């Protein structure tokens, strides 16, 4: 598959590394060896921190919010589908006429193909969120990363779609992710607004927490995980009602593809 059109020849990490090396050589020539090592040490520190900054395009191009000139916000839901949460979520989205993108986990999609069909039947789009949600997937070997992501692509292909976007588990990136996604034709999508709901384990005041920080252009990260018990599920439903009602009234929600000016998935010929 052809590389994605947003793929850059040299990442920020590669350019920064080259600059650090040149500075080290210059300082080594004009200053002390200890001084010369500073740019390289700083570069290593940045490389260690960068994987955990999901909004930074350090190792590869990352889209975390709108392109310039685009208004609105996009709703995204991670980790599903689940019988205990996805149908309710679809019902509420339909009630308030809100479009969403579901970044699904491959093993969940394989276990519940009827929910994938339901998501599509409601007019929503689907992205790849890895097969097992290994939090450190992006730090694994090239082979492991590609097998994991490709397995999810294959599962969703059986539903008649080909996702064109990938969200790494918990937003962790690495230089190993770039060539894999380029080969598979996937664009990395992260987020610019989140509530730290811990996969719907903490839904207290979810609506107010979102609305206080939500801005035009945001990609909002929420979760499609079933809450811990029936009482928590009722709380989650009530919070979603409040959030979706406010978003519907403000007419702020647009499809993710519209926000980023890039397709999220393609339908396969059957």
Task: Report residues per predicted region.
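A short acidic, helix-capping loop that chelates divalent metal ions and anchors anionic groups
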Residues: 133-140, 228-231
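His/Asp/Glu-enriched short active-site or ligand-binding loop at hydrolase and phosphoryl-transfer sites
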Residues: 172, 178-213, 251-263
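Catalytic grooves of carbohydrate-active enzymes
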Residues: 210-260
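CE4/NodB-like, metal-dependent polysaccharide N-deacetylase domain
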Residues: 90-104, 124-125, 141-172, 179-182, ...
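Short beta-strands and strand-loop turn motifs
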Residues: 23-27, 44, 128-130, 189-192, ...
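A cross-domain feature marking catalytic cores of carbohydrate-active enzymes
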Residues: 77-79, 104-106, 128-130, 167-170, ...
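Active-site beta->alpha N-cap acidic-glycine motif
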Residues: 49-137, 151, 155, 161, ...
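N-terminal pre-catalytic segment of deacetylase/amide-hydrolase enzymes
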Residues: 1-75, 83-95, 244-270
